Amino acid sequence: MARLEVDILTLFPRMCAGYLGESILGKAQEAGLLAATITDIRDHATGKHRVCDDAPYGGGAGMVMKPEPLVEAIEAARARLPGAWVVLTSPRGARLDQALARRFAEHGRLILVCGRYEGVDERVMTAVDMQVSIGDFVLTGGELAALCVVDAAARLVPGVLGNAASADAESFAGVEGLLEHPQYTRPPEFRGMKVPEVLLSGDHRRIERWRRREALRATRERRPDLFARLSLPESDLRLIEAGDDEL
């Protein structure tokens, strides 16, 4: 019997529990067609206060989720769900559509990582298989997006819906804009991966140029549809190809 197994990694477990236990998803769990686990990321944090965030290197507003508790939570989830795809919900990710939801349903095992605050430390991406976005807008956290992924995939599992026609897809148009640049926070080195030197330099002009370059590169790589709509000045086109020593 086909079923979908998911583990949602979040700082706010109660935000997900209610939705997963209701309606079609609740019935799917009762029928054994959906197995949903919710993991509190703080269980993998250390110290009295189990801190999971810190200020971003290079300055800026907001806080960034630290790599240690997130990566350890992902590794523990992988041990529970061998072969699962690790999916980070992020505005920087590929757009969730019906085709991707079907891929998730067919794969059958997902670990969904919910971001918070200003984002997650870029070094966490080494433990992530893909990033997924539900649209060109920003939420206060990734929990709603993770629930969208579970809902969209679970309803494609045979037997979850009484009427298979209910799974018809809809299309949504995107809006123009750049994806966000990578974020980093303490420690300066994690498992051999170092924070880019420019973010530690204190040179705000270089930092802003680095962020602009990385945003342009991320958009070109992950959302070529958005990138194609941009009317970029020659300076941006040169910046995309510039090395760190040219910032």
From Swiss-Prot:
A molecular function GO annotation: tRNA (guanine(37)-N1)-methyltransferase activity
Catalytic activity line of the entry: guanosine(37) in tRNA + S-adenosyl-L-methionine = N(1)-methylguanosine(37) in tRNA + S-adenosyl-L-homocysteine + H(+)
InterPro entries attached to this UniProt entry: Alpha/beta_knot_MTases (IPR029028), tRNA_m1G_MeTrfase_C_sf (IPR023148), tRNA_m1G_MeTrfase_TrmD (IPR002649), tRNA_m1G_MTases_N (IPR029026), tRNA_MeTrfase_TRMD/TRM10 (IPR016009)
Entries under SUPFAM superfamilies matching the protein: alpha/beta knot
Amino acids binding S-adenosyl-L-methionine: G115, I134, G135, D136, F137, V138, L139
Record-level GO BP terms: tRNA N1-guanine methylation
Protein EC: 2.1.1.228
Keywords per UniProt: Cytoplasm, Methyltransferase, S-adenosyl-L-methionine, Transferase, tRNA processing
A matching Pfam family: tRNA_m1G_MT
Cell compartments where the protein resides: Cytoplasm
Family annotation (Gene3D superfamilies): 3.40.1280.10, tRNA(m1g37)methyltransferase, domain 2
Cellular component GO terms, alphabetical: cytosol
Subunit composition and interactions: Homodimer.
Annotated family: Belongs to the RNA methyltransferase TrmD family.
Biological role: Specifically methylates guanosine-37 in various tRNAs.
HAMAP family: TrmD (MF_00605)
Family annotation (PANTHER family): TRNA (GUANINE-N(1)-)-METHYLTRANSFERASE (PTHR46417:SF1)
Name the record gives this protein: tRNA (guanine-N(1)-)-methyltransferase
Organism per entry: Anaeromyxobacter sp. (strain K)
